[in-house]
């Protein structure tokens, strides 16, 4: 370890860049190497519990705790819209608990670092790193993989948080151009269903998928392009439901005028692509930031959030899911529905921002150049 550090310390650095959400360690290394210009680049959102390290109390904001968001939070007075509601008070309490737990984890990390240096003496002449909280505060900018126009209404604007969501979409170009017209032999309505590459079947079991396919078959004017690793019922209408276990050309499908709906886990990359494409969503999250982002979709009015109710036997309540999905799909397939109108307006706003301020990649590189003076 000493030899590695000695080699690293002889190099010249302009800046250090890493992701803080899950790996604080690199920022301690940056400090030990004397790197003052540090940047945090997150593949996800800016976590609400990290606001406390910027001096912002998330409990005072109408923002759901990362894992606490549920369907309906933004649809009635029993949810987060009403600051007198039980749900609002519960969310505030959970935000407080999450804040304290993160602070506790950081303090334990600090103690571990202290013990490591003083009890084991694994690196000579190297001072103990600053606390994790201080390392976070030293970060010049936090770049997050989220569009600026796709965040909760009360999520605070901070000069330290820069939104570069869409950087890959803009480089690919297909979703920032005019929508592609469908050919005469193509269906007037295409529905895309895919739950990403990590867990292609999401949190579904066979019964819940069968319920979903039953609803698909009620809309015979549409073609449903489905990726579910062939984890499907034995009998279904293959004329309107195309199932594959291969990765679908998601951007290309979303770019078409006849694509009316995206049924997704609503991970950040899929959500961003849907927004740039102007395609409304039915969100059925499974893990990670998907619950938080599904709630965001609901608040923005660009889709519907359905949560799978899992029993103690690890089975989905297929009857409840079937009813929820039927209601959501029927709403989405109404001509000129409000979700389509709202996401069209959001797409227009994002593309106008791109035209006026330039690609996110340029903004990202320009901001780093400004900090390092090059």
Which ranges hold each PLM region?
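Nucleotide-sugar-dependent glycosyltransferase catalytic domains
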Residues: 1-221, 232-238, 312-313, 326-327, ...
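A donor-sugar binding/catalytic signature common to diverse glycosyltransferases
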Residues: 18, 246-297
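Hydrophobic beta-strand scaffold residues
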Residues: 37-38, 224, 281, 304
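Short beta->alpha connector loops at strand-helix junctions that form conserved
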Residues: 42, 165, 265-266, 284-287, ...
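Extended hydrophobic-aromatic, low-complexity segments
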Residues: 203, 235-236, 271-276, 283, ...
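Short internal beta-strands
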Residues: 223-229
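A short acidic/histidine/glycine-rich donor-binding loop in glycosyltransferase catalytic cores
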Residues: 241, 281, 299-316
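C-terminal "capping" alpha-helix adjacent to the active site of nucleotide-linked donor transferases
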Residues: 313-338
């Amino acid at each position: 370890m000493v030899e590695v550090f000695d080699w690293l310390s002889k190099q010249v650095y302009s800046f250090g860049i890493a992701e803080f959400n899950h790996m604080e360690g690199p920022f301690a290394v940056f400090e030990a190497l004397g790197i003052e210009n540090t940047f945090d680049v997150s593949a996800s959102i800016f976590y609400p519990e990290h606001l406390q390290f910027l001096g912002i109390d998330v409990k005072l904001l109408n923002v759901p705790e990362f894992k606490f968001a549920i369907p309906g939070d933004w649809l009635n007075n029993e949810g987060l819209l009403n600051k007198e509601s039980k749900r609002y008070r519960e969310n505030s309490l959970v935000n407080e608990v999450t804040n304290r737990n993160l602070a506790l984890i950081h303090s334990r990390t600090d103690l571990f670092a202290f013990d490591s240096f003083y009890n084991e003496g694994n690196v000579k002449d190297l001072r103990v790193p600053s606390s994790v909280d201080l390392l976070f505060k030293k970060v010049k900018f936090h770049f997050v993989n989220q569009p600026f126009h796709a965040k909760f209404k009360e999520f605070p604007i901070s000069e330290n948080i820069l939104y570069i969501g869409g950087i890959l979409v803009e480089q690919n170009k297909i979703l920032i151009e005019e929508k592609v017209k469908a050919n005469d032999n193509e269906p007037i309505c295409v529905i895309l269903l895919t739950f990403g590459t990590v867990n292609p079947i999401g949190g579904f079991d066979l019964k819940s998928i069968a319920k979903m396919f039953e609803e698909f078959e009620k809309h015979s004017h549409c073609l449903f392009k489905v990726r579910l690793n062939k984890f499907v019922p034995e009998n279904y209408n293959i004329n309107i439901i195309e199932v594959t276990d291969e990765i679908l050309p998601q951007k290309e499908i979303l770019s078409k005028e006849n694509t009316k709906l995206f049924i997704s886990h609503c991970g950040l990359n899929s959500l961003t692509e849907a927004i740039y494409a102007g395609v409304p969503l039915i969100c059925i999250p499974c893990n990670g930031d998907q619950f938080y982002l599904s709630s965001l979709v609901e608040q923005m009015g660009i889709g519907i959030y359905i949560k799978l109710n899992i029993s103690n036997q690890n089975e989905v309540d297929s009857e409840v899911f079937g009813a929820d999905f039927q209601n959501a799909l029927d709403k989405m397939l109404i001509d000129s529905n409000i979700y389509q109108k709202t996401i069209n307006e959001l797409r227009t706003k994002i593309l106008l921002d791109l035209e006026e301020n330039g690609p996110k990649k340029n903004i990202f590189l320009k901001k780093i150049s400004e900090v390092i003076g090059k």
